[in-house]
């Protein structure tokens, strides 16, 4: 984990998203509303606010973006990775 400061929210978001991987990130701020807005713009599968490596909730999707993997594990969303939906219609008479 690295800790970096930036001149503005836009600069911080640009710096954070300018990486090949996107598993997890943290935003530290006294203003939680501002941190939520930043978190929404980060290209990471998990974003913690004022915490890092906080335990993940098992009912929430877990997985990375970009080159940090494909899909979401440990939740109902993971079922979509193993499911193919097919529509079959049969005329019986």
Could you say what each language-model-derived stretch is?
Residues 1-93:
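Conserved C-terminal structural/oligomerization subdomain of aldehyde/semialdehyde dehydrogenase
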